[in-house]
């Protein structure tokens, strides 16, 4: 028999699936509050969709092959190119600004390690058709609101923000004006916290920067507020408009109530080649994990992919690192949850009400909206001691048991946490079996008030 899942891939047993669902619920709930609508696209796309603009790093990590029709295809390693293609195809018909989100499964062939697998699920949130800094602020506010929804605060997570246009202007003033050395600077800044200073110096020198330029470049990541730049840089005519734009952006974040989560960090450049403006990443404040989330403005990508000249911005937030952070902060559910609302057991009335009556009643209860479990054995229902069936119900995680307590009554008894202290309740069995709407509503109301409201006590 084959072993477990492939390296870097995951099986989702019920407990793990519940944890994934916990994250997905937060993603969808916050997206709903911000008026984003959900979409999806194919997991398999033409290879050149990813090799065109994503850069060499992703191109080398693709799961790609030639299909039976001779087409070069790849499993999606990211969602933004698919999103851009879809929007470009209907650019004239879509109401602007577009506010879409998706939760695709993505695939990259890379070394599996902590926080990075060969597959993961990722929330993608994108806005198309708006150039204002308010759209950039709205986007980051979505990401931070998700952190809050999951129980995290600004002491747990920091948002590090930069602007590629500002950085390009600063580099030009420093003297780094050509595309090739600028790309080398981006690569150094992206890794500056993870490599020794002398390595950064050597790489910048190799790119043709002078010692004076190198020193000026290496000062940039130390700037933590907009007043921290050298005066000759901050006052340069080419730089000032970009500083003003970032200041406006930060002001919007203040108004949205999330400014205290945000740090200026010019080492945040994002690895993908298509970002053009404000970019950001979210990290755990202790610095123990990889980036939780990253994104920014990519105003040229839609035009490059489909000829739709529309400004756009977005972010991706994966489930792997976020899940690790929630576990580290004890904010992740440990089990698959509460099980069924009700577990049907044989009681004192099992002889008067054989399994057929039990099946009719549980069917009616399911139609009324309850989740109902039972032992799937007529023999156990009739003959197994009630205490053994109740023990099975408790192990299943059911909130309460339900049984025929006599020939004329149904008994509901809570099982979970303080529900064990809640009073049991008896209902007349005949109206329930007759599908009497009033009787079923009475049971449902009692359950909602007595069981559901106490479940999380």
Predicted feature locations:
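TRNA-binding/sensing appendages of the translation machinery
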Residues: 1-81, 89, 137, 141, ...
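Positively charged, Gly/Ser-enriched RNA/tRNA-binding surfaces
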Residues: 19-35, 45-46, 69, 80-92, ...
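Glycine-centered helix-coil hinge/cap
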Residues: 55, 196, 234-237
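Acidic, His- and aromatic-enriched active-site or binding-groove loops in soluble protein domains
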Residues: 60-69, 175-204, 284
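Short, well-structured alpha-helical patches and their helix-loop capping segments
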Residues: 75, 95, 113, 117-119, ...
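Hydrophobic mid-domain F-helix/FG-region of cytochrome P450s
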Residues: 144-148, 165-173
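Short, surface-exposed recognition loops or helix-turn segments adjacent to catalytic cores
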Residues: 154-165, 263-267
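Acidic, Ser/Thr-rich low-complexity intrinsically disordered segments
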Residues: 172-183, 187, 192-195, 352-370
């Amino acid at each position: 028999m084959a072993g477990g899942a492939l390296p870097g891939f995951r099986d989702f047993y019920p407990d793990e699936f519940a944890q994934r669902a916990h994250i997905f619920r937060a993603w969808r709930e916050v997206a709903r509050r911000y008026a984003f609508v959900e979409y999806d696209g194919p997991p398999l796309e033409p290879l050149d969709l990813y090799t065109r603009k994503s850069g060499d790093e992703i191109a080398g990590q693709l799961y790609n092959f030639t299909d039976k029709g001779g087409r070069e295809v790849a499993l999606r390693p990211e969602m933004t190119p698919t999103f851009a293609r879809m929007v470009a195809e209907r650019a004239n018909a879509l109401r602007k600004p577009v506010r879409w989100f998706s939760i695709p499964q993505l695939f990259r062939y890379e070394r599996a390690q902590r926080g990075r697998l060969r597959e993961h699920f990722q929330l993608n949130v994108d806005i198309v058709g708006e150039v204002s800094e308010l759209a950039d602020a709205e986007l980051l506010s979505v990401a931070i609101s998700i952190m809050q929804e999951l129980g995290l605060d600004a002491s747990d997570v920091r948002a590090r923000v930069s602007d590629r246009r500002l950085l390009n202007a600063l580099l030009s003033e420093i003297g780094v004006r050509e595309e090739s050395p600028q790309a080398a600077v981006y690569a150094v800044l992206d890794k500056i916290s993870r490599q020794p200073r002398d390595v950064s110096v050597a790489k910048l020198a190799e790119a043709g920067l002078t010692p004076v330029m190198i020193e000026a470049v290496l000062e940039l990541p130390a700037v933590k507020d907009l007043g921290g730049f050298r005066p000759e840089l901050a006052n340069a005519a080419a730089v000032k408009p970009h500083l003003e734009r970032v200041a406006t952006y930060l002001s919007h974040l203040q108004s949205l109530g999330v400014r205290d989560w945000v740090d200026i960090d010019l080492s945040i450049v994002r690895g993908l080649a298509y970002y053009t403006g404000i970019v950001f990443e979210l990290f755990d404040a202790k610095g123990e994990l990889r980036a939780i989330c990253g994104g920014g403005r990519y105003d040229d990508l839609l035009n490059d992919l489909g000829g739709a000249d529309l400004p756009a911005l977005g972010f991706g937030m994966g489930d792997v690192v976020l899940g690790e952070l929630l576990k580290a902060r004890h904010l992740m559910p440990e089990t698959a949850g509460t099980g069924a609302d009700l577990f049907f057991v044989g009681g004192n009335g099992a002889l008067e009400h054989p399994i057929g009556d039990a099946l009719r009643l549980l069917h009616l209860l399911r139609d009324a909206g309850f989740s109902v479990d039972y032992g799937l054995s007529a023999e156990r229902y009739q003959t197994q001691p009630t205490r053994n069936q109740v023990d099975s119900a408790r192990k299943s995680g059911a909130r309460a048991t339900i049984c025929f307590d006599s020939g004329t009554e149904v008994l509901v008894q809570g099982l979970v946490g303080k529900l064990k202290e809640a009073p049991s309740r008896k209902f007349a069995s005949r109206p329930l079996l007759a599908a009497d709407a009033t009787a079923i509503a009475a049971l449902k109301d009692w359950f909602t008030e007595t069981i559901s409201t106490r479940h999380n006590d």
